[in-house]
Amino acid sequence: MGLFGSFIAKFSKDRASSQDLETFKNLLIEADIGAAFADEVIDLVKKADLSELPELISKAITAKLSTKNRELKISSDRLTTILIVGVNGTGKTTTAAKLAAKLKNEGKKVMLAAADTFRAAAVDQLVTWGNRIDVPVIVGKPNGDPAAVSYEAAQRAIQESCDVLIIDTAGRLHTKSDLMDELTKVRRVVEKLTPIDEVIFVLDGTMGQNGITQAHTFAKATDLTGIVVTKLDGSTKGGIAISVERNLDIPIKFIGTGETISDLREFKSEEFISELLA
């Protein structure tokens, strides 16, 4: 049962007590929905006829979600370039591979670039994924310049008439200004050859408000066009999606729901709200 559904079912007949409301508020906050929005939901419950509660909560959630386009921007007449950014441990490299597999299955000619040059494990992981899904991976020298790898990949992708280039950038802490500057350099160098169409931030869905702080910092360093929320194995932690979009107004484009290559699904707000209210 979804985050709100269990509450609605329990109190569909009886008015919730103060203790019930406090318990529910704590559950909302633990689910990373954010304290401010939790207060709004509780206020709705206090004032509304419980029979109207599902519709009222649905409207409240919709008002918090971004209205920006959630579809990937894919060019029809030139190379589409996507930067995948985020900190280590969020599932960034796996997300790059999942997205490559998805686009390949849709008939696109895809290339991957391993620009996380300072982590041999990340390069090896992307190469392994590339072999598994039959997508070429451009690899540079160990500890080499990530911008150089990205530039070479863009050259190759153009030469080989690829539809999409996905660049897995170095995982970096949002507190390291030199690494954030490096991300800006990658973008600047690639854009000498081809536009950057998407910059997608990978957010660990279990990190709560700290993940939102990270996203804020990345958004200052480079214009983010979308977010992928990973490690969402069920709707019980789905509150983070509301909190992210409420704070950043950057659309969630995909959700990672597991470890397999197919566990990446498009974020559809109507389905998301239905799951929360189920």
Predicted regions and their residues:
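Short low-complexity stretches enriched in small and charged residues
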Residues: 90-94, 120-124, 181-186, 209-210
